[in-house]
């Protein structure tokens, strides 16, 4: 598997469209001005930052144990490498999304789709699909005539309605933990509402904070409670009202993990499952089949869930309100989410996020 990964990265980095980042052959070459590569200064800054990071006591201790760590606690697991190399040559990445997927049968999204089809064909009608991603979207694509050709949320909800014993659990960032205000606006104003709210309630939620999020007639209504407590869809966002940015003592770092697992296997890789990962980036990851790795991911998932709120619940709404009222740098972007999302959509920038 290591050899296969090496070949993948070699093909990627040697692609003619990439800029070369040559290493220094000797320490004094930079000062002599031999290299005119503008990336060198960034590489130096990166090395200095890495040096500082490794000097932290906890990191230093873990680095000292790295040799042992790399040789212990491995699991016997079936593994398959998957990639998005097809994105290197795709020209019409949004309008030809289906054709592009079918032309790259080893792509991450193609294989996920086939695995789900196979599970359905084999009569698997119960279980839970777990997804962790910092910037999770659910793709919606149109052809050149503007006709909808695929809606990820719609497809998933249809599958769930046909399989009432299947659940979907998602963990992603919140306005408190996200480092990308634009993608978080898409998550809170589009992705989660498409899974949980009716079109009418989506319109109210998106209209304004006063008419939706801060309106007791909406968030305390029986309809709202019924919608957000979907028996099969659970969307959690990391963070809590005890955070240091709200005057508490808890530290919530940004979520950056990306993995999926189901009843017997899953996927771990670089893809965020947002538009940028799906359409433009050259993502890499491994599908696995084995209980050992799966159990470790279960433990990570449950740990993350214990420090998260379910989307739409009173606790989640309270966290958002307190973030908006705080004096942190998160406050402004949280208050402006609706305007941010509407601007992104009006300018057609969703697919670049």
Q: What do the predicted segments below correspond to?
A:
Residues 1-44, 123-130, 134-353:
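PLD/PLD-like phosphodiesterase catalytic module centered on the HKD motif
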Residues 14-17, 69-72, 104, 118, ...:
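Surface-exposed polar/charged interaction patches
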Residues 27, 38-111:
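Active-site cores of enzymes that catalyze phosphoryl transfer or operate on phosphate-rich substrates
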Residues 98-120, 148-154:
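A Trp-anchored, charged/polar loop motif used as the substrate-binding/catalytic surface
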């Amino acid at each position: 598997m290591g050899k296969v990964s090496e070949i993948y990265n070699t093909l990627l980095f040697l692609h003619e469209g990439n800029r070369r980042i040559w290493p220094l052959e000797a320490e004094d070459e930079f000062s002599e001005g031999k290299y005119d590569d503008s990336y060198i200064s960034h590489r130096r800054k990166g090395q200095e930052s890495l040096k500082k990071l490794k000097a932290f006591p906890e990191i230093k201790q873990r680095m000292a144990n790295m040799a042992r760590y790399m040789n212990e606690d491995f699991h016997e697991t079936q593994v398959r490498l998957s990639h998005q190399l097809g994105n290197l040559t795709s020209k019409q990445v949004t309008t030809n999304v289906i054709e592009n997927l079918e032309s790259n049968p080893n792509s991450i999204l193609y294989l996920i789709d086939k695995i789900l089809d196979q599970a359905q064909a084999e009569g698997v009608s119960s279980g839970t699909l777990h997804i962790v991603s910092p910037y999770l979207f659910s793709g919606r694509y149109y052809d050149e005539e503007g006709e909808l050709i695929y809606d990820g949320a719609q497809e998933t909800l249809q599958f769930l309605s046909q399989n009432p014993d299947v659940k979907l659990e998602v963990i992603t960032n919140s306005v408190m933990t996200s480092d990308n205000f634009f993608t978080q606006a898409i998550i809170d104003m589009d992705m989660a509402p498409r899974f949980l709210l009716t079109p009418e309630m989506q319109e109210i939620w998106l209209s304004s904070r006063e008419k939706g999020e801060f309106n007791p007639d909406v968030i305390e209504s029986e309809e709202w409670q019924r919608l957000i407590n979907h028996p099969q869809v659970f969307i959690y966002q990391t963070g809590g009202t005890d955070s240091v940015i709200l005057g508490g003592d808890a530290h919530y770092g940004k979520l950056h993990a990306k993995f999926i697992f189901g009843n017997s296997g899953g996927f771990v890789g670089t893809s965020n499952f947002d538009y940028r990962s799906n359409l433009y980036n050259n993502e890499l990851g491994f599908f696995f089949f084995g209980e050992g790795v799966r159990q470790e991911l279960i433990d990570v998932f449950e740990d993350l869930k214990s420090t998260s709120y379910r989307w739409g619940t009173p606790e989640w709404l309270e966290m958002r309100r307190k973030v908006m009222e705080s004096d942190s740098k998160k406050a402004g972007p949280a208050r402006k989410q609706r305007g941010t999302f509407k601007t992104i959509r009006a300018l057609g920038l969703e697919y670049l996020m």
